[in-house]
Amino acid sequence: MEHKDNSKMYGTTILCIRRNNHVIIAGDGQVSLGHTVMKNSAKKVKRLANDTVITGFAGATADAFTLFERLEGKLEKHPGQLLRACVELAKDWRMDRYLRRLEAMMIVADKSVSLVISGNGDVLEPENGIAAIGSGGNYALAAAKALCESNDKFSQNMTLEYIVTTAMNIAAEICIYTNNNIIMEKIED
């Protein structure tokens, strides 16, 4: 995500992997203000809806908290219907003048679906169960895909936690807006 305003606090890399009836969303802990690291231990991954939904954000921190609140409201209105709640949030995001200015993206997941909600109000389900957002998102995504799609016996025995941690650490080595203080939330069936 491009940082348009150096006076806003940004949070960056979020990775979601769904594999073998488990889903993990992980986020790094770095918050940047312009080119300065303001915090190394921010929690950008949260549980919502009585711990049945996990979500992570990248982008302007204050904007992301606004979206968390809106999503919580939609989940209360549509319990157990994550896709519908996200589509309703996206509609509001596209139509509301204030929300359209928010600079954030989210990944949300429950036991059955993972979704990316973009800053344009799009709701996308990743094809292969792997999604990443933020400035280090492409690095984390590439590393996660390589680890998940490898066919040797070693990779088949890797835990989901190992894959997520390794991919996030690779992103942290490459992206200056990402650190290796990784926080994960997991839902298992």
Curated annotation (Swiss-Prot):
The reply to whether Cell cycle figures as a keyword in the UniProt entry is no
Pfam families from the UniProt entry? Proteasome (PF00227)
- What GO MF terms are annotated? metal ion binding; threonine-type endopeptidase activity
Q: Which GO terms describe its biological process?
A: proteolysis involved in protein catabolic process
Q: Which annotated residues bind Na(+)?
A: 172, 175, 178
InterPro entries reported in the protein's UniProt record: ATP-dep_Prtase_HsIV_su, Ntn_hydrolases_N, Proteasome_sua/b, Proteasome_suB-type
The catalytic activity of this protein is classed by the Enzyme Commission as 3.4.25.2
Q: Which UniProt keywords apply?
A: Allosteric enzyme, Cytoplasm, Hydrolase, Metal-binding, Protease, Sodium, Threonine protease
Catalytic residue positions: 12
Output the Gene Ontology cellular-component terms. Answer: HslUV protease complex; proteasome core complex
Tell me the domain of life.
Bacteria
Q: What CDD domains does this protein map onto?
A: protease_HslV
* Locations listed in the record: Cytoplasm
Q: How is its activity regulated?
A: Allosterically activated by HslU binding.
The record's SUPFAM superfamilies line, in alphabetical order, gives:
N-terminal nucleophile aminohydrolases (Ntn hydrolases)
For this UniProt entry, which residues form the secretion signal?
Answer: none
Q: Which reaction does it catalyse?
A: ATP-dependent cleavage of peptide bonds with broad specificity
Which family does the record claim for this protein? Belongs to the peptidase T1B family. HslV subfamily.
Instruction: Kindly state the subunit structure of this protein.
Output: A double ring-shaped homohexamer of HslV is capped on each side by a ring-shaped HslU homohexamer. The assembly of the HslU/HslV complex is dependent on binding of ATP.
Q: What does this protein do?
A: Protease subunit of a proteasome-like degradation complex believed to be a general protein degrading machinery.
Tell me what this protein is called: ATP-dependent protease subunit HslV
- Species whose genome carries this gene: Ehrlichia ruminantium (strain Welgevonden)
